[in-house]
């Protein structure tokens, strides 16, 4: 989903690109169904990126550790990553003055960044 008009981010392009790549890679790696990504413009000059993907109900996620380096959730998964992707998302989002949050129950990750 995209807004009907252009959204200009007042940010470092390479950092935003890395954030989106890491979110998508993580979603693809752990998804058990269709992935939905959206971009919305909010009031207060903010862009909101949301990625939603269904995960295997057997996957255990500790919300308190989700953005920690090397945290991989369910270590028994054969396609588990290194555990740095979401930590990098958090680091870069913080550097850009934004915010990242997770709704574990519905498996939605949200990144909010400043726009022009």
Language-model features: where?
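Conserved micro-motifs of the catalytic ATP-binding
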Residues: 4, 8-11
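Short helix-loop "hinge" at the ATP-lid/N-box region of the Bergerat-fold HATPase_c
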Residues: 27-28
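Short beta-strand/loop element within the Bergerat-fold HATPase_c
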Residues: 34-45
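Short conserved segment of the HATPase_c
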Residues: 58-71
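A residue-level detector for a conserved hydrophobic packing site
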Residues: 16-17
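Short alpha-helical Gxxx[C/S/T] motif in the catalytic ATP-binding
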Residues: 85, 89
């Amino acid at each position: 989903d995209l807004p009907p008009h252009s959204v200009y981010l007042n940010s470092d392009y390479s950092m935003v690109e890395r954030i989106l790549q890491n979110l998508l890679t993580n979603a693809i790696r752990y998804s058990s169904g269709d992935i939905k990504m959206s971009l919305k413009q909010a009031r207060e000059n903010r862009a909101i990126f949301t990625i939603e993907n269904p995960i295997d109900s057997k996957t255990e996620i500790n919300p308190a550790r989700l953005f920690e380096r090397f945290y991989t959730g369910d270590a028994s998964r054969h396609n588990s990553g290194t555990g740095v992707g979401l930590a990098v998302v958090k680091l870069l989002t913080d550097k850009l003055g934004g915010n990242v949050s997770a709704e574990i129950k519905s498996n939605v990750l949200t990144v909010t960044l400043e726009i022009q």
